[in-house]
Amino acid sequence: MKKIKWQKDYSFRDYPKQWTGINPLQFTRYRSYVNRIKPGICGTYVSAALVHYLLKAERDYEIDMELLLRVLKPQIEDRQVYRGTFAWDLRDGLNDLLVDDGLYQARFHLVSNPIVIRELSKESPLPVIVGTTRLFGSKYGNHWLLAYAFGYNQEGQLFYRTYDNHGRTMAVIPASQTLACVWLEKKT
């Protein structure tokens, strides 16, 4: 992807030294789930990983990721006639999948920072889907990733540690290059 003139290159030295959230080793199981479809279906991949993580963490139930991908693709990627996926597409697809469960509902917000910090600071956090945008200089362009930890570097910049559905389970992205987010919360 062509670099935008205001895009900043971050190196390992720019990253936070301490992270808050979920242990990255819990996401290595998703390394082999790489989005190779053109155009990409990154929203489906991160939604499947979020549901898979939820079921494993809270119910110790191991569901087949391939099954989740097959079920979620039409509910997320094929919902509307427009190209690409928006936060509400992920929310609605997740809610369609979880409706019979009755315990969780998907929500979305147009700004990721307050939600990621709140959700990953909980005692038993769940990962949060975050959307990067090319307009803000993301090397991923417009893309959905699954954030499971956050941290601040020495300059006070907020970063997320993510599963990027390109084969990396410890990808670090600056929060300033994200926009919307989608998360699951328990129904009250």
Model-based region annotation:
Residues 1-83, 153-155:
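Active-site-adjacent structural segments surrounding the nucleophilic cysteine of cysteine proteases
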Residues 4-6, 11, 69-188:
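Conserved active-site-adjacent core of cysteine acyl-enzyme catalytic domains
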